[in-house]
Regions:
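Extended ligand-binding clefts on enzyme/binding-domain cores
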Residues: 44, 239-240, 246-351, 398-418, ...
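Conserved, well-structured interaction surfaces
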Residues: 90-163, 193, 208-215, 342-351, ...
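Sec-dependent bacterial lipoprotein signal peptides
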Residues: 1-28
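Membrane-proximal, proline-rich intrinsically disordered regions
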Residues: 2, 30-78, 305, 389, ...
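Short, surface-exposed recognition loops and adjoining beta-strand edges that mediate ligand/DNA contacts
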Residues: 41-45, 70-85, 165-174, 215-292, ...
């Protein structure tokens, strides 16, 4: 994405103005920072253009989303050499083996999304001031507010997938949630609240964002209405509210339903989705690089999963490349919607995910025909031309089994598998015990284990005194 020199200079000024406070975000209840007032930042954030510059900070708003969930999931494995690689810390190894005491001493995967929340809150407060003064175009301000609400809800959702229990309608009012930072004032004390409060805020923010955002955006690093509906669909899916997930996915697809014909891609490329921002991308974001997920010489795709791709399924050759030498017989992941060969994985929102969410909603409602219609629409673009035979299903249960299987194959390394495991484990039809081996020892993770909720980083606990997750 190219920007003018004026943009870059303006962006640098704004970034420097807020940087000094970001390191203390959410790490403490801020007693030692009581002399720093939020106005020290807001004095330099005065116009709608300033707000847009903040939201366009790609390094804060679109990157660094948590990757510990994907690293804890079951779509890959490590050889003993990979497990012992010097690029992995002991904490990374603990995450891989689901060690009960595995806790990050540092807080990067907590602070990074809360940094984005901080930016979003600054924008929300500035927009309200501009509205009260009547000093800016209302349409512009509404879009800025919608964008900030989108980013805040996205971050709350991402944090909740790691550090709050999976949503359950029967216990959400009691289960500890995450701190909901709704102000840029760092003096506000962090409190966890409940899972119900967490998801209520996520849904409220997204519903308002949908009403404010424009249908399209100039670049996919900026939110739009289709992306907000898509994020709402993802949130409802994680809440097991399948009717609302289906409706939200449908609303997103009404605005953008473009799919890539994989027959047009170079199956031999290690970056087949070049250039960046392909037409399926509704909103572009990236996970923080995780050493255990490095596809170059560490992470190998689960062979049971590899074998589910048919010979004429182009995803087998586009998403997977055979390794050589000592790693012959294993496969690396090359299906990243971010055209990079590192572990800088795309975890944004895309059209294919919306087809799968809508299909799952149809299947769970017993509408096998509609579910297979969506699944076939997607898969026709994934198979070699002339080889795909439309799937059929005898009933909703049969359709659901097919949709769930294809969801895992299609959304490989998108940062969604951990959330899917947390959700699907509550259904005995899909519950599974995960198993991994390292240095001759086998490690397991049963369905619904408390370890599906990660321990909050020690640095956060030390500084904020919020309650830790149980073990």
């Amino acid at each position: 994405m190219k920007h003018s020199n004026k943009y870059l200079k303006g962006h640098t000024v704004i970034r420097k103005a807020v940087y000094t406070l970001l390191c203390v975000l959410i790490l403490s209840s801020c007693e030692k920072y009581v002399d720093i007032k939020k106005s020290s930042n807001q004095a330099l954030i005065e116009t709608a253009n300033d707000c847009q510059l903040l939201l366009d900070n790609y390094g804060v708003m679109n990157t660094g989303y948590p990757s510990d969930g994907e690293a804890s999931a079951d779509d890959y494995y490590l050889t003993d050499d990979g497990y012992l690689s010097t690029s992995l810390t002991q904490t990374d190894r603990d995450r891989y083996t689901w060690a009960p005491s595995g806790i990050r001493p540092g807080a990067a995967q907590w602070v990074s999304p809360y940094k984005t929340v901080y930016y979003a809150n600054l924008v929300l407060e500035t927009v309200e001031e501009l509205k009260s003064k009547g000093s800016a175009d209302v349409t512009v301000l509404n879009n800025l507010r919608g964008s900030a609400l989108f980013f805040r809800s996205l971050c709350f959702w991402q944090i909740a997938q790691l550090y709050a229990k999976p949503y359950s309608a029967t216990s959400a009012e009691q289960d500890p949630g995450i701190p909901l930072r709704l102000s840029s004032d760092i003096n506000d004390k962090s409190e966890r609240g409940t899972v119900a409060q967490t998801y209520t805020r996520i849904v409220q923010d997204l519903q308002e964002a949908v009403s404010l955002l424009q249908p399209t955006s100039t670049v996919p690093t900026r939110p739009n209405k289709a992306a907000a509906y898509a994020m709402l669909a993802r949130a409802y899916l994680s809440m097991e509210d399948y009717a609302q997930a289906q409706a939200s996915a449908d609303a997103s697809l009404q605005l953008n339903s473009q799919l890539i014909d994989y027959n047009t891609l170079d199956v031999n490329s290690y970056t087949p989705f070049f250039p960046r921002f392909n037409k399926e991308v509704l909103f572009h974001s990236l996970m923080e690089q995780h050493p255990a997920l490095n596809p170059n010489d560490i992470a190998k795709i689960n062979l049971d999963l590899v074998n589910t791709y048919s010979a004429n399924d182009l995803r087998r050759s586009i998403f997977l490349k055979p390794n050589s030498g000592d790693n012959t017989g294993s496969y690396r992941f090359t299906g990243n919607y971010e055209p990079a060969t590192s572990a800088l994985f795309f975890n944004g929102l895309a059209v294919d995910e919306m087809y799968l969410i809508r299909a799952e909603g149809y299947a769970r409602a017993g509408n096998a025909t509609a579910a297979m219609g969506d699944l076939n629409t997607l898969l026709r673009t994934r198979w070699k031309t002339g080889t795909y035979v439309d799937m059929t299903a005898v009933d909703g249960t049969d359709a659901l089994n097919k949709v769930v299987a294809e969801r895992r194959k299609e959304l490989l390394m998108r940062g969604l598998r951990w959330t899917d495991l947390r959700r699907l484990n509550k259904d005995s039809r899909f519950a599974r015990t995960l198993s991994r081996s390292a240095q001759g020892t086998t490690y397991t993770l049963p369905p619904n284990d408390v370890r599906y909720t990660l321990l909050i980083p020690q640095e956060v606990i030390n500084n904020s005194q919020i309650s830790q997750n149980p073990r």
